[in-house]
Amino acid sequence: MRYLVTLRVVSQPGGPPPADLMEAIAKLGQEAAETGALLDQSGLAPSSEGARIEVSGGRLTVTDGPFAEAKEMISYALYEVRTKEEAVEWASRFLKLHRDLWPGWEGEAEVLRLFGPGDFAPPA
């Protein structure tokens, strides 16, 4: 099963992430890739560089960022694992690195299962 993990920052100390955190993230990503669990990952640009498209009342509206949410989405990872618990474990390890190596950083991850065409096939 494929899972999308998104990371949102709630608050963080000023300045860039510590070098030891970035090194630990790279090692965790390498480990996940070597096991075949990690399919893709990347940081995300601030919402000020994005857009939101909405359909409401039959109208399509495009709004340029930034968006008012207090929690900025900053990265994602795409995993291929056997269970939701495995995806949660990878996401937890990622967040633990932030907790342990960047004092004062606060954030959250969402783990969402992806559907494919086979999930919508008619019953045999």
Model-identified regions with their sequence ranges:
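Conserved, structured core segments of small domains
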Residues: 1-124
